[in-house]
């Protein structure tokens, strides 16, 4: 599934074994020197040091420009005090995170260097390189994360953000990852955060951090508690509105946050690795490539359907992997149809188009029905129809290995328009003029309408009824039942 507003590198990872005699949930040892702003026995998000750090970071944000700098010298005295509160809090909290010791020490150094620079554009590369959460994928292990960064689907400015989170890594995922290797993949649960994460952002990617250069082949994290919570909220409302009789497995997910979190971990783990697997006609990460947005729709949907296909096969197992594989199939289907299709603006909404495409494909193949204002599925026939769409996208990719880039774009458009109706004013639908066809790829992209494939009447009506529900999921966590 896409979790981005702009194309981003997908990532892969493998857990590192931690010695058995290490506490799985680090606490402050009773015999260490006490620090007034860290109190033993309190949960992390209630620690005074965390609350001080969170308040200081939040107060610092209005002083920062979009690039993270603080240009007004008149704000520097206040900024120095706030940064001092941040670094003091990090040092006080560090004993709670022994696995992140090198990172937290480097973070203090980066903050001090930023102050010494006169609050120029921040450079937190050193602390980012020291932060390696993929090396400690242990269920429940906490992390303290503090960086100047933008948050995807959240803040567009590189402001100082702080968050507390913990790892989601159940035993069945550790077993699954031995086959579906994803060595830099990190799954997390949000505990508390600054305003940049009180949004729709559900990812933590290194490339969002303010730094002098972007490291290569690095980790990536997804907050599955947020994904699961908004799935449960949205699907509950949408199924009531559409009078959908939910299958028992899907109904279980709506009443069980942890079950749904684990299901999303499985989906995301397989999805992420799929970006660089298969017969691919182009750079699977699509880095720095400007192209029509419907190509991103197909790529994200391809990876979701690859996960769906894998889970159809795994669903025959009689164990935790099999149980969750059957639930992933519902998650892909309902998240794509009920949330993706009607979330966000209609400006080059590639995730939205993927949901529209899946719905229309299933409807046109007679396995999804909207009759007498009630939604229904022929569940026995759904897997074959979904896999048929996956096959169609895979076929497009395989054939395009032998095509020029813009010819691939044209073929991709034909696949999408064969299922979803384009805008009546579309140049692509009428046929691009000769000067565009003979020109540079930029002309092709410029000719795509912002809303090249408008919502159908079904989705227009559903969006109006679901608008408030979806809007209310901004900032949601697994605790918000």
Model-derived features: where do they sit?
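Contiguous, non-catalytic segments that form substrate-binding/exosite surfaces or channel walls
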Residues: 91-251
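Post-HEXXH active-site segment of zinc metalloproteases
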Residues: 279-301
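Extended, compositionally biased alpha-helical segments that mediate assembly or anchoring
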Residues: 7, 40-151, 160-162, 403-481
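Long, intrinsically disordered low-complexity tandem-repeat segments
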Residues: 20-38
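An active-site-proximal "capping" alpha-helix that borders the catalytic cofactor pocket
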Residues: 296-312
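Active-site recognition of the HExxH zinc-binding catalytic motif
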Residues: 267-280
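Short pre-active-site segment immediately N-terminal to the catalytic Zn-binding motif
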Residues: 251-267
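Long, well-structured alpha-helical subdomains associated
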Residues: 40, 261, 308, 312-423, ...
């Amino acid at each position: 599934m896409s979790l981005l507003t702009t194309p981003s590198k997908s990532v892969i990872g493998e857990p590192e074994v931690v010695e058995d005699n290490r506490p799985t949930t680090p606490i402050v040892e009773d015999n260490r020197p006490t620090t007034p702003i860290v109190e033993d026995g309190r949960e992390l998000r209630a620690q005074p040091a965390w609350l001080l750090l969170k308040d200081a970071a939040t107060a610092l944000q209005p002083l920062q420009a979009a690039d993270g700098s603080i240009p007004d010298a008149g704000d520097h005295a206040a900024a120095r005090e706030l940064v001092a509160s941040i670094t003091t809090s990090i040092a006080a909290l560090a004993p709670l995170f022994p696995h992140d010791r090198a990172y937290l020490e480097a973070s203090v150094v980066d903050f001090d260097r930023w102050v010494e620079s006169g609050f120029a554009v921040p450079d937190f590369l050193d602390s980012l390189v020291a932060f390696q959460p993929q090396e400690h994928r242990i269920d429940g292990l906490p992390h303290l994360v503090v960086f100047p960064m933008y948050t995807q689907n959240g803040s567009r400015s590189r402001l100082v953000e702080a968050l507390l989170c913990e790892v989601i890594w159940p035993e069945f995922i550790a077993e699954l990852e031995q086959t579906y290797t994803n060595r830099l993949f990190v799954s997390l649960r949000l505990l508390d955060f600054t305003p940049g994460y009180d949004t729709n952002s559900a990812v933590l990617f290194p490339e969002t951090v303010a730094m002098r250069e972007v490291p290569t082949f690095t980790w990536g994290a997804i907050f599955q508690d947020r994904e699961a919570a908004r799935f449960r909220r949205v699907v509950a409302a949408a199924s009531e509105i559409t009078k959908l009789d939910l299958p028992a497995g899907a109904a279980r997910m709506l009443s069980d946050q942890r079950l749904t979190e684990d299901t999303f971990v499985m989906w995301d783990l397989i999805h992420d690795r799929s970006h660089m697997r298969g017969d691919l006609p182009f750079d699977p990460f699509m880095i720095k490539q400007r192209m029509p947005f419907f190509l991103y729709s197909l790529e994200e949907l391809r990876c979701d359907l690859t996960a769906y296909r894998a889970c159809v096969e795994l669903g025959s197992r009689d164990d935790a992997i099999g149980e969750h594989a059957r639930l992933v199939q519902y998650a892909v289907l309902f998240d794509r149809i009920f949330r993706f299709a009607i979330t966000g603006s209609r400006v080059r909404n590639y995730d939205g188009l993927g949901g529209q495409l899946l719905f229309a494909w299933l409807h046109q193949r007679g396995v999804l029905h909207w009759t007498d204002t009630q939604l229904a599925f022929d569940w026995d026939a759904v897997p074959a129809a979904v896999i048929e769409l996956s096959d169609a996208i895979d076929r497009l990719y395989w054939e395009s290995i032998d095509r020029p880039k813009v010819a691939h774009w044209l073929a991709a458009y034909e696949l999408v328009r064969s299922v979803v109706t384009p805008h009546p004013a579309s140049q692509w639908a009428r046929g691009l003029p000769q000067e565009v066809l003979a020109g540079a790829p930029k002309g092709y992209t410029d000719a795509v309408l912002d809303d090249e494939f408008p919502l159908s009447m079904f989705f227009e009506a559903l969006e109006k009824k679901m608008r408030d529900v979806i809007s209310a999921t901004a900032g949601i966590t697994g605790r918000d039942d």
